[in-house]
From Swiss-Prot:
Lineage of the species this protein comes from: Bacteria, Bacillati, Bacillota, Clostridia, Eubacteriales
Gene3D superfamilies in UniProt: Ribosomal protein S20
InterPro entries: Ribosomal_bS20, Ribosomal_bS20_sf
Gene: rpsT
Species for this entry: Clostridium botulinum (strain Alaska E43 / Type E3)
Protein name: Small ribosomal subunit protein bS20
Free-text function comment from the UniProt entry: Binds directly to 16S ribosomal RNA.
Length: 87
């Protein structure tokens, strides 16, 4: 357990940021699963709208520092390839 006041504050801040990051990552995974389901079901229109949502979510997560920007770019690229393979 921390004894110094600033260390105690850092523990609180870390817990808060951990919860926020977990929420963003969970939402991101949910949106990606929705896109994957649309691709698996050969639903092109639904896949296109889901892809826009995935792209936006990845950009937000990358800008907030929740995920690395290269990881976001890689995911977007791979998901775009899946979308283009459908059409």
């Amino acid at each position: 357990m921390a004894n110094i006041k600033s260390a105690k504050k850092r523990i609180k801040v870390t817990e808060t940021k951990t919860l926020n990051n977990r929420m963003v990552k969970s939402a991101l995974k949910t949106v990606i699963k929705k896109f994957e389901a649309a691709v698996a079901g050969n639903n092109v229109e639904e896949a296109k709208t889901a892809f826009v949502a995935v792209t936006k979510s990845l950009d937000v997560a990358a800008s907030k520092g929740v995920v690395h920007k290269n990881m976001a770019a890689r995911k977007k690229s791979r998901l775009a390839a899946k979308l283009n393979a459908m059409a």
